[in-house]
Amino acid sequence: FIFSADNGTSTRIVSKQKDGSRVRGGKGSPTYRGTHVPLVIAWGDKIGGKTSDRIADLTDIFPTIADICGIDIPEEWDIDGISLFPEINGEEPLEKDLCLVHFNPLWPTTPAPYASRYAMNDDYAYFWDGRIYEYKKDPEFRNPVMYADASEELKAAVADLKARVDEVDFYPDMPGQPRRSDYGTFYDFAPPQNPF
């Protein structure tokens, strides 16, 4: 049994935390509260009773299922995810340094005016335009970290995050630019034919 979600809860929902604080949902936004979701994996008496605060995303589901089933994924597929099975099976976890978040909703009635993209590691989120946030302390992404004041360690992390953001093509819209696309142009795009 694998349960997760594709976005945070509605902004109309305010959840009370164990410490008494209240957190408003962030669905429909590229903030930490809009993209941070639970991941629950259960398998009878084989998997359960463990928690992890490791960085993971939905690209990890396919390799995890393949690993559980004993299926090798061909290297030429060049997938982004890793198997979480070693960790949930009590073995040494595979390393995952960062996740990429691309936000470009194509809502038919009230489209978001801008696309956005960032890469995040265990501590920081680096946006396409150079903004850096310490997202656990600033989940709404309101107070960017000043790069000029950053430690050498943070500058090295930013270089890795920036490389990930820059290596993926932007389609259909460039972050920060007014939208060029809508449902019609997005879905009229003719992708290459599937070779399988």
Language-model regions, residue ranges each:
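Generic enzyme active-site microenvironment
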Residues: 4-5
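The feature captures the short pre-catalytic strand/loop hairpin that immediately precedes
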Residues: 39-47
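Long, internal low-complexity/basic segments
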Residues: 61, 115, 121, 137-196
